[in-house]
Design a protein with these regions (language model features):
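A short, N-terminal "cap"/entry segment at the start of jelly-roll beta-barrel domains
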Residues: 1-42, 47-49
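Short acidic/polar mixed-charge low-complexity motifs
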Residues: 37, 46, 66, 75-77
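Ligand-binding loop in jelly-roll beta-barrel domains
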Residues: 91-118
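His/acidic/aromatic-lined binding-pocket segments of jelly-roll/cupin-type domains
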Residues: 38, 49-52, 56-61, 78-79, ...
């Protein structure tokens, strides 16, 4: 794998906004990465289920807002992020990210075994 050159993320978003539409709404920025999934994720999304990862997940909000609903000790709690906000979600904690129209964020998580990460 060749080493990728740095790029301007804001420029990438401006040039690729059309790719960030439902039903998928996300794009893996480094398909060849060995350990991490680095995604730009846009809203809106209709996800209402909770899921969890075996490892931590980093949310960095670029545009608009996101609510990350979590289950903490059996109680529902909501983490609200706006532009410039960052949140490191703990491993093995159920969560449900909800993005509205106009929401764009960077999400970084470790790859899971047997995972297809093309998009």
């Amino acid at each position: 794998m060749s080493i990728k050159a740095p790029f301007n993320l804001n420029k990438w978003i401006a040039e690729n906004r059309g790719l960030l539409k439902p039903p998928v709404g996300n794009k893996n920025l480094y398909k060849d990465a060995g350990d991490y999934i680095v995604m730009i994720v846009a809203g809106p999304n209709a996800r209402k289920d909770y899921h969890y990862n075996e490892t931590e997940e980093l949310f960095y909000q670029l545009e608009g807002n996101i609510e990350v609903h979590i289950q903490e000790n059996g109680e529902k709690r909501t983490m609200q992020l706006g532009p410039g906000d960052m949140y490191l979600h703990p491993a093995k904690v159920p969560h449900s990210p909800v993005r509205k129209e106009g929401s764009i964020g960077l999400v970084i998580e470790r790859k899971r075994a047997n995972m297809n990460v093309d998009d």
